[in-house]
């Protein structure tokens, strides 16, 4: 069995980072006065000395994501406007191969440059409709996009695993 914290990404992110269940009729992320009062795992980690960053290859202003991520404790929010990358894009933003390569490079760079622990969260988007990915493995666009994201996450983990820092890393994958 698989369980999801919500049926929408904005609600799933709040469940993941603040422990607040996804609401069926509204998104607390869009209600800044309420969202600002929620606890945040990134804030707890920041207070313990972690550098915190949220990376998304799309527009972080969509559904008020940027404001929520800052309010729950991320020190830095990187989205498509701050990446200056080239490559395949869907209507939502950069494809997962581009974003995960960027994120892996940034994580490795930060770990090597700083003497502090790092907490990075990355939101993928290639498995979102309209399921347009630079990849042709399966017949249906939906399953093909899942296979693409799966392969890119594998590449991301392998890139991190190839570093000396791997022994001190923990990679957690969660659905929204």
What annotation goes with each model-predicted range?
Residues 1-176:
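Solvent-exposed soluble domains appended to multi-pass membrane proteins
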